[in-house]
A protein has these predicted regions:
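C-terminal, well-structured subdomains that either form a transmembrane helix-short loop-helix hairpin
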Residues: 188, 295-301, 308-316, 331-334
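Short beta-strand-loop-alpha-helix junction that forms the active-site gateway
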Residues: 294, 306, 311-326, 352-354
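Active-site metal-binding core of divalent-cation-utilizing nuclease and nuclease-like domains
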Residues: 179-180, 234-309
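Domain-level recognition of nuclease-like catalytic cores that cleave nucleotide substrates
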Residues: 345-407
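Short Cys/His-based metal-binding microdomains
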Residues: 25, 177-229, 307
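Metal-dependent nuclease catalytic cores in nucleic-acid-processing enzymes
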Residues: 328-343
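Extended C-terminal regions of large enzymes
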Residues: 3-185, 387, 391-394
Length: 407
């Protein structure tokens, strides 16, 4: 892929970074295998093997007895501390298997897992020493896992852009100033040309409509997914209304599972109309409220007096939560006025990072409209791909003052 040599190898093997690549560390696998062998001998049911004092030689790569001893100590300490919460988890969200009450096989697996966790901690510590390459650890977005099949299908240019943009290794003016001691600025506005500035913060690029162009491409992809689900729900409602089950003598009626059909916001009606603010001046219907705000998408059912307002933002990944709060507060008054007028109003503020990392709000939105499992995963993959390609085009255009590559 011709990645720069300054890219740390820990970025390829880390399991906690926001971009998880399908590679594993040979040293980590070697240490885990040696630890498994040693624990197998130490915890053997055969007393002769257990008391034989078999030594597992790991060479200069690892000190297996010390690592196994430290792993056991960690497991005992965790048993004394209890089950701590991680992130925004509530009480009782996770259960921990205790080392003292586990079987021999479970103890062996727990020790190997602890050895791997220690290696991951060392990688994270080393990555935090690099302020640019470790910045993605602070992003409030779900982890994105890249598989071997994705690497085979993706173009080399898009794959290199994804990896370099996540770890901030693109030759931006700010990086050139740090690498080569130059004094370059953003070509369009003359400010510091960091990657976040180029992809989502340049005011001149905003006035030229470059960010709007990327925004519309992502919005069209979301609108296509919403329209497909609206059509699917309408067909299901029609089939459910006309289907008659005939039961023969001696047989029982088969229960039909409509769980997914009832637990989404689009299953209550079949006259939904999807309108997108692309090339038109979209406005909220006046019978709901009178406002000058123009949402990105509205989903209206006049028979049931329901409306869904979708507001999309494509910010930098470290500003996703701030952007979501601003959008929700922006339309809160409209939601209150609509409810006073007898309408059921739902506000969806969704975000997709400029590098192609959909936020949690996007996953929640797709779940609300009826996407589950593989279908939701497919939509998220398409959104990531569209955003990556658009941001790659913006990155190329940042070297020129016009889209055509002139000037």
């Amino acid at each position: 892929m011709k990645l720069p040599k300054s890219l740390s190898s820990h970025c390829f093997y880390s399991k906690t970074t926001k971009l998880r690549l399908p590679y594993s560390s040979l040293i980590e696998d070697f240490k885990a295998a040696k630890a498994r062998n040693l624990v197998t001998f130490q915890e053997s049911r055969d007393e002769c093997i257990k008391n034989a004092g078999i030594v597992v030689d790991a060479g200069t790569k690892a000190n297996t007895p010390a690592e196994v001893k430290e792993a056991k100590s960690r497991l005992r300490v965790q048993e004394l501390v209890g089950v701590p919460n991680k992130g925004k988890e509530g009480l009782g969200m996770r259960k921990r298997q205790y080392y003292s009450s586990s079987s021999t096989k479970q103890k062996r697996d727990m020790i190997v897992k602890t050895v791997r966790e220690k290696e991951e901690e060392c990688r994270v510590v080393k990555m935090t020493n690099f302020p640019n390459q470790g910045a993605n650890l602070r992003w409030e977005v779900p982890q994105r896992q890249v598989k071997h099949n994705d690497i085979i299908k993706a173009s080399d240019e898009r794959l290199k852009f994804l990896i370099k943009s996540v770890y901030d290794l693109l030759p931006t003016p700010a990086n050139k100033n740090r690498w080569f001691n130059t004094e370059e600025k953003c070509l369009l506005c003359g400010l510091d040309g960091t990657l976040a500035h180029i992809l989502s913060g340049c005011k001149v690029a905003l006035c030229l409509g470059r960010y709007k162009w990327r925004h519309d491409r992502v919005l069209k992809e979301i609108a296509g997914a919403v329209q497909a689900k609206v059509t699917e729900n309408a067909n299901k409602a029609e089939n459910r209304r006309t289907r008659i089950q005939f039961v023969k003598e001696g047989q029982q009626r088969k229960e039909v599972n409509h769980e997914e059909e009832h637990f989404n916001h689009l299953s209550d009606a079949k006259d939904w109309k999807v309108t997108v603010d692309v090339g038109t001046s979209l406005k909220i219907p006046t019978e709901i409220c009178i406002t000058n705000l123009r949402p990105d998408m509205i989903i209206v059912s006049r028979k049931t007096k329901q409306i869904g307002i979708v507001e999309l933002t494509v910010p930098n990944e470290d500003r996703i939560e701030v952007s979501g709060e601003l959008k929700r507060s922006k339309y809160e008054q409209i939601a209150q006025e609509g409810r006073l007028n007898g309408w059921r109003v739902k506000i969806w503020a969704v975000e997709v990072g400029c590098r192609g990392f959909p936020a949690v709000s996007m996953s929640a939105f797709l779940k609300d409209i009826g996407y589950r499992g593989a279908s939701k995963k497919k939509v998220i993959e398409n959104l990531s791909k569209v955003t990556e390609e658009a941001s790659l085009s913006l990155w190329k255009a940042s070297h020129y003052k016009e889209w055509g590559g002139k000037g």
